[in-house]
Amino acid sequence: GQTDLIPVVLFIYALTFIKRTNFRVAGVLFACSIAAKHSMIIGVPFVILYLWSHNGNHKEFQNFLKLFFGSLLLFEFPFFFSDAFRMMVLENREMDKIYWLFIDMGKENLIYLTPLVYMLLLYFFWRIRRVNFDLLLASMGVAFSIVILMTPSPPGWYLWLVPIFAIHQSRHGFGAIVLVGFFSLFFIAFHLLHTSGASTILFDYNQINISIVQSPIVQSIHYTLMVGMGFLIAIQILREGVRENDYYRLGNRPVSLGIAGDSGSGKDTFTKSITTLFGRHSVVTLSGDDYHLWDRYIPHYHHSYKH
């Protein structure tokens, strides 16, 4: 687990440079994080789509890609011809866990659910088009959650979620803190009770041995609750990220529209059409006639100041 700290720190540090629009340094740091642990590549497609969605950064986007792929090739190429590197890294049995959850369609046709859900999330992120940095963080947090929660991942992988969960709690208050708190309790209790090698420093024995919690059914229920809490947090992160990505804040702030034109040009007709479209409960109409000193249909209107 402690070896996951280095790639996670490098990855989060790279994101800070994305926030500062220093894409060249970010590209190098992302390459370093992937070289430290290949699983960090999970978040890179979201970063690429984020940079691509900002039309004003084409040149910087190209620089990011050049430095990212160039640095990654520089770090990895010397080891490509090593049998030990191929066996321990490229053929690591931990990577096969993403294929453990599947639907058997018969005739040796399997639908692998973890890659499928990841691709659907990536497609959803791409279709939003205009993406802000908060939604980038949210989507990557959900992507890492998908890989971790839908595979029998070791405890160290959960370190990938710590920065995202910490940011989520700091921004969204009590509800987020409660969910992450319950998830943490379920996680610690599960590995304390059911994972070999777990030990308690306070008590002088390696694993708590309570017969009722050692049964497969209780263990499975415990694991289901832990994964369920993790998915609830992922849904909450994605929901808040989409809500904050509302570019013009149309869902939270009223919008003012000014309709101008000569008399008889159809201003009132257009206003009534908008009111019908959105509903009278959602529209407040302020007419210029409301600011006249005299009604337009009485003689004073034509022989005095109108306003």
Q: Language-model segments: which ranges?
A:
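Multi-pass membrane glycosyltransferase architecture that uses lipid-linked
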Residues: 1-91, 108-253
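Post-Walker A helix-loop "phosphate-sensing" segment adjacent to the P-loop in P-loop NTPases
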Residues: 275-285
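The conserved Walker
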Residues: 263
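N-terminal intrinsically disordered, low-complexity segments enriched in P/E/S/T
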Residues: 96-101, 303-305
